[in-house]
Amino acid sequence: MSDTLLNPYFGEFGGMYVPEILVPVLKQLEQAFVEAQNDPTFQAEFADLLKNYAGRPTALTLCRNLTKCTKTKLYLKREDLLHGGAHKTNQVLGQILLAKRMGKTRIIAETGAGQHGVATALACAMLDMPCRVYMGAKDVERQSPNVFRMRLMGAEVIPVEKGSCSLKDACCEAMRDWSANYETTHYLLGTAAGPHPFPTIVREFQKMIGEETKRQILEREGRLPDAVIAAVGGGSNAIGMFTDFIDEPNVRLIGVEPAGKGIESGEHGAPLGHAKVGIYFGMKSPLMQTEDGQVEESYSVSAGLDFPSVGPQHAYLNEIGRADYVSITDEEALNAFQELAKHEGIIPALESSHALAYALKLIKQNPEKEQLLVVNLSGRGDKDIFTVDKILNGGTN
């Protein structure tokens, strides 16, 4: 891969493991991205869309009630307030501008929780691009509000009935479509994973989350946080938060994977702590695998975290010890979901609830410890209210 413009690897992780027919397409994308990063006109248009369409910068909110009787200050980076309801809108706008720059006339995407699909649909509507979204049939059912939003904004939503009918299967179908239609189509990948250059592109189009957080916390508290905490599925909201803090050694980076029904049950989506390295989705990264090397089914109550692998930069940060990766069960995430709603009047996405749950766990372990924590509230929970209601009233997800 020595002829790429950017390093395709993070340590041993990453790469471009795709059919030969897609290699020149990925290199074209890399070339366009490098040129766009150095083009003031592109950057100005992207910045304008982020400010005047998406609503950046997002707020940094101090939790007034969750930390009562403790010495912790807990802030939430409010990506739930972004247009579209989650952090996904940031990088979607950047990628569609790139697609237009390359002369592409059609956008495809995959989605799990539906937030990336909604972000893609709204941006395609505004920027006048046709849009097809692949979504696991199981996720179509449990995220029906987002499916309606996507279709309302003109997107074609394709339920994927193969495999586990979840995010990994939607990713595979999107890849197949792209392989057949790459001349006209841009695959708007939704997370900081997949083949190079997607992990780098998505990180660069999400890193304003951490940049804003750093400015805001310094303004509010006069110092950097002790830790920033974010949920990790593929890893885009987390890498967006972490990037500007990587070179701040006194700031702990904590990624929270889904432990599902408990790691010991086998029903989880925590490859960083409990998987072997494999090749999947065009990249080399930790991958949940069966004994004979087949991709294992991941599980989480949160559709957006239900993914058997993880972005390569997270794998690298884990390997070198710069970031810590922990896991939170469905039950713990559901409790955090309710706690934030009840005590702060904010309904978080189930994805974000995993990060919040770990922050609350840290606080409860040592309530007398003076600490400054920031949780990336990556999305709002409107999409999850029916799922949570069903679970709390005796059903199952």
From Swiss-Prot:
> If you read the UniProt record, what top EC class would you report for this enzyme, in one word?
lyase
Q: Which InterPro entries match?
A: Trp_synth_b_CS, Trp_synth_beta, Trp_synth_beta/beta-like, TrpB-like_PALP, TrpB-like_PALP_sf
**What cofactor does this one take?**
pyridoxal 5'-phosphate
Domain of life the protein comes from: Bacteria
- Gene3D superfamilies named in the record: 3.40.50.1100
Membrane-traversing stretches: none
Query: What interactions and quaternary structure are annotated?
Result: Tetramer of two alpha and two beta chains.
Q: What does the record give as the function of this protein?
A: The beta subunit is responsible for the synthesis of L-tryptophan from indole and L-serine.
Q: What is this protein called?
A: Tryptophan synthase beta chain
Species name: Haemophilus influenzae (strain 86-028NP)
